[in-house]
Regions:
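Conserved catalytic-core segment of nucleotide-activated headgroup transferases in glycan assembly
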Residues: 152-238
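Hydrophobic/aromatic beta-strand patches that form the interior of the parallel beta-sheet core
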Residues: 40, 62, 85, 115-117, ...
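Catalytic binding pocket for nucleotide-activated donors in carbohydrate/polymer assembly enzymes
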Residues: 240-242, 269-340
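Short, charged, surface-exposed secondary-structure boundary motifs
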Residues: 51-52, 71-73, 94-99, 148-153, ...
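C-terminal amphipathic helix plus adjacent low-complexity
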Residues: 312-442
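Active-site and donor-binding regions of nucleotide-sugar-utilizing enzymes
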Residues: 2-3, 7-158, 171-173, 177, ...
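Soluble or luminal CAZymes and related metallo-dependent hydrolases
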Residues: 24, 119, 198-206, 340-344
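Donor nucleotide-activated moiety binding/catalytic core segment of transferases
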Residues: 223-272, 276-277
C-alpha cells in the first residue's frame, strides 16, 4: 500500500500595504498551493489575532519586519504553536547599515524567529554583525515583489504605453516629514533627526520641481504618486491645482509604471522596479553631499542635481535622444538575489520545507496547550463574536479584501503560467482568506 503523503503546514503571510504587497502575496500563494501547501492572507492585525487566540492551525507565520516592537508579538505567536519567519519589506532601501540596524532590527526579536529572509548579499552583510550567533537563521532569497517583474508574470503588467501623451511619474518618499494624518512619527537620535530635516527640505524642492515640469511640459501627463505612509492631502494641496497633473496612488506601482515614459524619484524602491521594466529613471538629488540617497535606487538611476538638468533630461527622452544607462545587472544581483535565477518564492518555500523536515526544530505543542487554545477560542467567540474595527490609517493602506478579488488575480496569474493550476479560495474567518493546497482540491 503506497505511503500517504504528509500534510504540509500552512503559511500565514499577512498584508500591511495593499498597493505594495497584494500581488506578490497572491503569486506566492498560487505557487505555494501548487507545491502542496495552503496559504492564509489578510491584514496583519487580523492574521495575528487569529493566530494568538488559537483559532488557526499551527503553521509558518511570515512577518514584514524584525524591529524591537515585534518581540512580544513573536513570543505570543510562537507560544500558540506557530513558527515565526521574517521577510522585511524595507530591507532593500535604507540610508545606511547603522540606520537600518538601529530602526528596524532587534536581536531580542530574532530569538523567536527561525528564518530571516534577506533581499540579497548586501542586506545579509549589513545585518550579520548584529545577528552574531544567529547566522544559520539568515537565508538570502530575494523578495516575491520582484518575482512579479520576471517572465512570464511581467506580461500581466505591460502594454500600457500605446498612448498619445508622454507620461511623467513623480514618486515621493517623505513619510518621515509628511506622515499620514493621525500617525505619529518618533524622532529618535541624531541620525533620524538629520533624516527628518533632509526629507522636509526635499519635499519643498520636489514641490518646486513639479511646478516647473508642469509649466515646461503642459501637454504631458504628469502624475504624482505619494508613498503609502505619506499624507496624500499634502500633495493635493501643494500641486493638485495644476491642470495637467493628477495625484494618486491606487493599485500597485508597477501598473502605474507600465504606462510611464520617465520616472523621477529620490531614494524610492519604485526606481528599481522601473529599471527592471525598462522605464527611464531620474534620481533628483539637489542636496549635496547626500548620504541619504545611497543604495540601489541611486545606482540604477540617472542622477540629476538641478532643475535645468531635470527639464533637459525629460526633453531628451521625449525626443528619443537620451542615451540609455549602462547595464548594471551584477550590481542589481548583489542587492536582489532573485534578479535572475530561481524565483524568490521558490527559494523561500525550499527553506521552509527544509525547516519543516528538520527534526530538532519541530515544535510539539503539549496536549494541555492545545486544550487551552480551544478554550481560549470559545471564550473569545463569546466575548467578541464580531471583528475588531481597524483604524482609518490602516484602512487607507489596506482596504478590506474580497474573495472575488483574490480569485480574479489568481486566475490572471494562472493564465500567464500554464504550469500552475487554479486553487480553491475560502474565507475561514472574517477578512482572512485561505488559498487551498491543490492537493486538497482533488
Amino acid at each position: 500500500m503506497p505511503k500517504k503523503s504528509r500534510k504540509l503546514l500552512p503559511i500565514y503571510y499577512p498584508i500591511e500595504t495593499m498597493a505594495r504587497e497584494l500581488d506578490a502575496r497572491i503569486l506566492f500563494s498560487l505557487i505555494s498551493s501548487n507545491r502542496g501547501r495552503s496559504v492564509f492572507i489578510g491584514h496583519k492585525s487580523d492574521i495575528a489575532r487569529y493566530l494568538i487566540k488559537g483559532s488557526a492551525p499551527s503553521g509558518f507565520y511570515i512577518h514584514k519586519s524584525i524591529a524591537e516592537k515585534q518581540k512580544n508579538r513573536f513570543q505570543k505567536i510562537k507560544s500558540s504553536g506557530h513558527r515565526v519567519l521574517v521577510n522585511d519589506e524595507e530591507g532593500l532601501v535604507y540610508p545606511s547599515a547603522n540606520y537600518y540596524n538601529q530602526s528596524r532590527v532587534s536581536k531580542e526579536s530574532m530569538k523567536n524567529v527561525e528564518i530571516f529572509f534577506c533581499w540579497g548579499k548586501k542586506h545579509a552583510s549589513d545585518v550579520l554583525p548584529i545577528f552574531e550567533g544567529y547566522e544559520k537563521k539568515i537565508v538570502i532569497a530575494g523578495h516575491p515583489r520582484f518575482d512579479l517583474l520576471r517572465s512570464p508574470y511581467i506580461g500581466l503588467i505591460g502594454g500600457g504605453k500605446s498612448r498619445n501623451k508622454f507620461k511623467i511619474l513623480v514618486n515621493t518618499n517623505f513619510a518621515l516629514y509628511n506622515p499620514d494624518k493621525g500617525r505619529a512619527v518618533k524622532i529618535l537620535g541624531r541620525e533620524m533627526q538629520e533624516g527628518y530635516n533632509y526629507k522636509k527640505m526635499m519635499a519643498r524642492l520636489f514641490k518646486e520641481m513639479i511646478h516647473k515640469i508642469s509649466d515646461e511640459f503642459p501637454l504631458c501627463d504628469l502624475v504624482v504618486r505619494p508613498h503609502p505612509s505619506e499624507d496624500i492631502g499634502y500633495w493635493v494641496r501643494e500641486v493638485g491645482n495644476l491642470e495637467n497633473l493628477s495625484v494618486r496612488r491606487e493599485g500597485s506601482a508597477i501598473y502605474e509604471l507600465s504606462s510611464t515614459d520617465i520616472l523621477i524619484h529620490n531614494g524610492c524602491t519604485t526606481g528599481i522596479e522601473a529599471r527592471f521594466m525598462g522605464v527611464e529613471v531620474l534620481s533628483y538629488e539637489p542636496l549635496q553631499p547626500n548620504k541619504w540617497n545611497s543604495g540601489l535606487p541611486h545606482l540604477v538611476s540617472r542622477s540629476v542635481e538641478t532643475l535645468d538638468q531635470v527639464i533637459e533630461s525629460i526633453r531628451l527622452k521625449k525626443e528619443a535622444e537620451l542615451e540609455s544607462c549602462q547595464e548594471i545587472n551584477e550590481v542589481i544581483k548583489f542587492y536582489i538575489e532573485n534578479a535572475s535565477g530561481d524565483l524568490s518564492i521558490h527559494r523561500m518555500l525550499q527553506a521552509i520545507e527544509g525547516l519543516e523536515n528538520s527534526r530538532e526544530k519541530v515544535i510539539a505543542v503539549p496536549w494541555f496547550n492545545k486544550i487551552l487554545r480551544l478554550a481560549k477560542k470559545k471564550v473569545s467567540l463569546i466575548r467578541n463574536p464580531g471583528v475588531i474595527p481597524r483604524s482609518e490609517y490602516s484602512l487607507k493602506k489596506c482596504p478590506h479584501l474580497k474573495l472575488e478579488q483574490i480569485e480574479e488575480k489568481l486566475s490572471q496569474y494562472c493564465s500567464r503560467d500554464k504550469d500552475l493550476k487554479m486553487p480553491d479560495v475560502s474565507e475561514p474567518w472574517p477578512r482572512c482568506f485561505r488559498i487551498n493546497s491543490i492537493r486538497e482540491n482533488v
